[in-house]
Each structure stands twice: as structure tokens, then as C-alpha cells.
Amino acid sequence: MDKKKALLIVFIIILLIFLGRPILWYCMRPDGATMESREEILNDIKDGTRWTITTERLVEGYVISGAVSDRGEAMIAVFEPKENGKYKLQTATRRDKEEIIISGSIINDVWYDFIWFQGASTERAEIIYTVPNVTSQSSVYLTDNDTIICSPTTYKDYTLQVTYFDSEGNKYE
């Protein structure tokens, strides 16, 4: 009888180990509730690349993050709200830091264009939407605080031209 009890105890311990690991892994996953947690989520995207979030903004409850990597890249990441203040990565667009990132996502049934540039210190950006058979529309945004531009649009067929300007008038396209 003692041998059966010992085998039962060993079996239960082995079962707890096998069941406990996935449960522990699930509980320790980053939940996106803090900037540090969202960085962990970004660091899981690509092996070996370390991301640091440098700017964030809220758009209708979604967190839009701008991050830079240890490999000279920049990224716009969109985090979708979940229950209890948690966030899930919805989309991420990565480019070389010297390039202007143009990305987009649907938030609450509205398409948003997201634009961010890490290549130089800039003061403003001019965005021109060109729509067939419609007069082009231009908007100017201040960008002196590492701002991610979030531009809602109802256009379905359009082109987008973005030009950043620094304090000396230099253009970045």
C-alpha cells in the first residue's frame, strides 16, 4: 500500500509540474497595462531586437506607441484595449529610423493614418491627402515633442504625401 501511495504522490507531482508550467507562463505574460509591459510585447516580435518606447498617445482608448530599437529601427505599434486596463498588440509597422513611418489601423470603425519620424529633430509636418476628382487637402502638425501624428480619414482611395521640416527649414520626405 505504501508503494501505491508513493506512486500516486509522484504522479500528482509530475501532473502538477506539467499543468503548472503553462498556467505559470500564461500568468506571467505581459498584459500591456504599462509602458514597460508594452515594451515586453514589442520585444517578443522579433528575436534579438530590443525596443524602447519613446512616445505614446491615446486615440479613442487605443494606445499608439512609438518605439526605437537597438538596431537603428523605429516602430509604430497600435495596442487595442482589453478588459481590466490591459492591452493587446493590434498592429506594428517597423522601418529604418531615417525613414518616415506611415501606418494605419481601424479604430472604432474609423481608419486612422499614423505618421512618425525619428530621423531628425523636427518642428512640423505637412500632410497632403490627394483624392481622385477632389481638391487636395493639406494639414500641418506640430512635431517638436516626438509626436505621432494620428489622422482619421474617410477616404477609400487616396495618396498621402508627408514632409517634415526642422527649425532651419530643411525638408525630410
Give the role of each language-model region.
Residues 83-86, 95-99, 133-134:
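Exposed regions on extracellular, virion, or secretory-pathway luminal proteins
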Residues 5-24:
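Hydrophobic membrane-insertion alpha-helices, especially the h-region
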Residues 62, 70-78, 98-100, 124-126, ...:
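Short, surface-exposed beta-strand/loop "edge" segments at domain boundaries and coil↔beta transitions
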Residues 18-92:
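N-terminal export/targeting and maturation segments
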Residues 72, 118-125, 155-158:
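Short proline/glycine-enriched turn/loop motifs at strand-loop junctions of beta-rich domains
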Residues 1-2:
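N-terminal hydrophobic targeting signals that begin at the initiator methionine
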Residues 91-116:
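Extracellular ectodomain segments of secreted/surface proteins
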Residues 126-173:
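Ser/Thr-rich low-complexity repeats and stalk/linker segments
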